Amino acid sequence: MNCIPIVNENDAISTDELTKFGGNDILSALVAEFCNADVLINMSDVDGFYDSDPRSNPDAKMFDRVESITDEIYSIAGGAGTDRGTGGMIAKLNAAKIVTEAGIPMFILNGSDPEILYTLLDGGHIGTYFCADKSKRKADDAED
């Protein structure tokens, strides 16, 4: 398609859909899977996925890469996040699970920096990368 869809439920007025989709995280994962996207980039209020909440723990360590989403990874994720969003890190992990199991990788990046997408596209090592399930690679990748 050569496009970048930006998916955002209107959290302030759209509450019925939140119970159906689980917020922007799940909705974006479903759209990415439906579109057979190359990658899902999830913009957050933190730099990536951490071993504890970096807002309350200055010693929190960010994961550069997550190979698969296990029960241990879920147990690290913890609570509901901030009052700006609805799903917190658990919803982001659920989204990552949807897309990675469909063969689509995902990044969690800090969305407060407008230049961060350029950094990523230029090959910068930022955020947390969730690896796609290699056995579920998209059909067009298998032909390469």
Regions found by a protein language model. Give the residues of each.
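C-terminal catalytic "cap/lid" subdomain
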Residues: 1-144
